[in-house]
Amino acid sequence: MMKGRNKNAGHRLKDCHFSKEEQESLVKMFKELTKDNTGSIREDKLDRSQFREVLHSIFKMTDDVIMDRVLRAFVKDHEACINLYEWLTGLSVFLKGSLEEKIQFCFKVYDLNSDGFISREEMFHLLKTSMVKQPTEEDPEEGIKDLVEIIIKKMDLDHDGKLSFKDFSDSVNVEPLLLECFGTCLPEQKVIDSFMVMFAVPTP
């Protein structure tokens, strides 16, 4: 099924937000990234280390846990590599997604064990990796636990002690700033603008 999708990526995909020209440029970029040292395409997939380098060098992401989860949010199966179709549709949400698409994306990133919920343990783990420890803090873990409880109180709308997708979606729709409350998993707008300007079609 994926092979068919890869073939179709040469045409403009209907399920992404890029123009034909932008999509063609992203296809070229993907092919460049998947070349080996001899200049030939060794495989039509981006592996984990290649994708992490893209996230770090182009999109300025630094959190190891979040970067691995972003990879998982891009792929449609359980592989640790990204094919061309996933590259295009993933970047479509990553760079130009609607709020609803970004809510789905971020929830998938934060749901570390993919069970359909963000548990207290997952919240703690995500916040612990994303927060910078201050030298004056005696026990930063206690502060993180307190923050988890504040978030639970605010976002756990059905009061079951964890966040379902509905809890997360409803909370973010009311207060969009909660979208990345467990760590930055989308690039800043200025980074997106700098990236997209490379694909801008010159005006005559």
What feature does the model see in each segment?
Residues 1-75, 82-110, 120, 148, ...:
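EF-hand Ca2+-binding helix-loop-helix modules
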Residues 12, 50-51, 66-73, 84-88, ...:
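EF-hand and EF-hand-like helix-loop-helix modules
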